Amino acid sequence: MSILNFNKLIDHTNLKANATYEEIERLCHEAIEYGFFSVCVNPAYIRTAKKILLKSPVKVCTVVDFPLGQTFSEQKVYEAKTSIKMGADEIDMVINIPELINGCACVIDEIRQVKKVCGEKILKVIVETALLNEEQIRKATLACIDGGADFIKTSTGFSTRGASLNDIKIMQQASQNKILIKASGGISTARELIEFVKVGADRIGTSRSVKLMQELKTMDLAK
């Protein structure tokens, strides 16, 4: 892959609680300009993003029960269903972390319920690796596979740390290529982006997408 093609792996993200209409509008226009795979926005901005991106190939991604994952499964199903009706192409849902750590089968059932309403739309399950040990990351990966998720995602970006290369390696080894992997949170340089893709990340979530692409372009020109 040419380093300039990394744009197609990026979910260009703004999930700030105080994100303004102007910031989301700029996010969408940047995604069009740089050819990012999607924009990832809070549900309140789905319609805004969809309207701006309507004639472009850029997808609209949103979040469910973000960033804590602590609401009822029924509420997560409702949020996902409503988000898709509003125009979301992809759903990033936060799992119930304590139940995941406790090994509750309800986690798998919750993923299945949300995936059912997603249908052919993409479901990514956020497991917040900062709060898990290595064995729990392995179990989380298997739970996402059993629940029928399309992706397992490392982080919300709101916890004690974002993605690590070791997180991706563990997920890759545990999954045996049965699920895609999204790395998000804290990826701030082009070299980090390249390393995450090398170890197995299929998608990258970042708010620094434009900076990364500019760095990648410089690296490409320096060859």
Swiss-Prot record:
CDD domains: DeoC. The keyword Cytoplasm applies. The active site is at D92 (proton donor/acceptor), K153 (schiff-base intermediate with acetaldehyde), K182 (proton donor/acceptor). Pfam families: DeoC (PF01791). It is found in: Cytoplasm. GO terms for molecular function: deoxyribose-phosphate aldolase activity. Transmembrane segments: none annotated. GO terms for cellular component: cytoplasm. It is an enzyme of class 4 (lyase). Keywords: Cytoplasm, Lyase, Schiff base. Its main location: cytoplasm. It catalyses: 2-deoxy-D-ribose 5-phosphate = D-glyceraldehyde 3-phosphate + acetaldehyde. Its EC number is 4.1.2.4. SMART domains: DeoC. Pathway: Carbohydrate degradation; 2-deoxy-D-ribose 1-phosphate degradation; D-glyceraldehyde 3-phosphate and acetaldehyde from 2-deoxy-alpha-D-ribose 1-phosphate: step 2/2. InterPro entries: Aldolase_TIM, DeoC, DeoC/FbaB/LacD_aldolase, DeoC_typeI. One of its GO terms (biological process) is carbohydrate catabolic process. Catalyzes a reversible aldol reaction between acetaldehyde and D-glyceraldehyde 3-phosphate to generate 2-deoxy-D-ribose 5-phosphate. HAMAP family: DeoC_type1. Belongs to the DeoC/FbaB aldolase family. DeoC type 1 subfamily. This is Deoxyribose-phosphate aldolase. It comes from Mycoplasmoides gallisepticum (strain R(low / passage 15 / clone 2)). The lineage of its organism: Bacteria, Bacillati, Mycoplasmatota, Mycoplasmoidales, Mycoplasmoidaceae.
